[in-house]
Amino acid sequence: MRYLTAGESHGPSLTAIIEGIPAGLTLHPADIDHELQRRQGGYGRGARMSIETDRVQISSGVRHGKTTGAPITLTVINKDHQKWLDVMAVGDIEETLKLKRRVKHPRPGHADLVGGIKYHFNDLRDALERSSARETTMRVAVGAVAKRILAELGIDMLHHILIFGGITITIPSKLSFRELQERALHSELSIVNPKQEEEIKTYIDKIKKEGDTIGGIIETIVQGVPAGLGSYVQWDKKLDAKLAQAVLSINAFKGVEFGVGFDMGFQKGSQVMDEITWTPTQGYGRQTNHLGGFEGGMTTGQPIVVKGVMKPIPTLYKPLMSVDIDSHEPYKATVERSDPTALPAAGVIMENVVATVLAKEILETFSSTTMSELQKAFSDYRAYVKQF
C-alpha cells in the first residue's frame, strides 16, 4: 500500500491516490466523510472551517460499494478557492495581480522562509500553500480507508488529549477502552474528563482574544493488534519507528513517545519492563503496558499507545517580528487565517495516520489481494499466536 497527496490550501481541490488496497473492501464516501467531518470539528477552530464542508469524491478504484483492487482516487473540493482565483491561477496573470497576496514577511515557526530559500521562491506563498495543514485533509481521507481495513480485522482505535495548552487532563481511573473512546468522541475538546471542558474553553477564548495560540499532547490507543507486526532484523522495518515518522510528519508535531515514554528516563528497568503472563484462554499477555505495545520494533499484542506533542500554531494574529525578504528590514510576520488551537483536529489526523501505517504493515505482511484472503490469513495468524 502506498499513497500520494496533492493540492494547495487555496487551490481548486485536494487529491490522494492510494494503491494496494485489496479488492472486496466495502467502502462508501460516507465512511471517508465521517472522518473528514471529525477533522473539521472541535472547539477553537477558525473561519476556514465555517467555509469548507469537506466531502470526498471517489473517482476510481471503487464500484458498487466495493474496492476493485485498482488505485483509488480521492478528491476534496476547496470551496474557498473561488475567492482566490487570481492568486492561485495556474496560467500566467498580470504582474499587479501576482502581487495581490504576495507573502514576503515569513512567519516564525512555519515553512515560509526555509521553503522559499530551498525552492528559490520570490513569493513565499508557494511554500505556504503546500505546507499548510490543509494538506492533512487527504491524509485523513486515506486514513479513513485504512480504518475500514482495520475494522474488518477487529482492530479499533481512539485518541484523546492529555495536555491542553498547559492544562493537564485528569483521567478517571479504570476507564475501559470503550469508555475512553465514547468520552473522547462526545467531547468538543477530545478530552475524557467532562468536568474540565469549561475551564479549557474559557482558556481557549482568552488565548484567541490575546491573538495567541496553544499546543498540547495527544494520545492515540490502538486495540486488537496481535503480537509480531514489524521486525527487528533491519532498522527501517521497526514498526514503532514507522509510526514515529508518520506522527512527526503531521504539521506542527515536534515529539513522539510510546507507553510511558520519556518518563522511562527516571525509572529503573524493574519498574519499566512489562512482565509476561500466559493463560489457556488468552495465550500470552502482560502485567503492564509501560512500553506502549512494542518490544524490538514489534507489537507485543498489548494496546499500542503512542503520544505526540503539537506545538502552538505558528500563525499569530498578534504577529512576531520577521524580516522583509526584499529589503531585509524588520517587519511584522504575515498574518494568514488561523485558529487559537487545532488540537482536537490534530488528534483526528494523528489517529488516521497511525491507522494508515498499521494497515500498510498488515497488507505487506499478509496475503491481501482480496479482503477475504486477508481476513483468513489474519485470522489464522491470530490463532497461531494464541497457541504458540
Swiss-Prot record:
Keyword set, alphabetical order: Amino-acid biosynthesis, Aromatic amino acid biosynthesis, FAD, Flavoprotein, FMN, Lyase, NADP
Subunit structure: Homotetramer.
Protein family according to the UniProt entry: Belongs to the chorismate synthase family.
CDD domains in the cross-refs: Chorismate_synthase
UniProt keyword Lyase present: yes
A cellular component annotation (GO) from this entry: cytosol
Protein's name according to its UniProt entry: Chorismate synthase
Coiled-coil residue spans: none
Function: This reaction introduces a second double bond into the aromatic ring system.
Cofactor(s) required for function per UniProt: FMNH2
Chain residues that bind NADP(+): R39, R45
EC number, UniProt record: 4.2.3.5
Catalyzed chemical reaction(s): 5-O-(1-carboxyvinyl)-3-phosphoshikimate = chorismate + phosphate
Encoding gene, per UniProt annotation: aroC
Pathway: Metabolic intermediate biosynthesis; chorismate biosynthesis; chorismate from D-erythrose 4-phosphate and phosphoenolpyruvate: step 7/7
Gene Ontology molecular function: chorismate synthase activity; FMN binding
Binding site for FMN: R130, S131, S132, N251, A252, G296, K311, P312, I313, P314, T315, R337
One Gene Ontology term from the biological process aspect of the record: chorismate biosynthetic process
Co-factor binding comment: Reduced FMN (FMNH(2)).
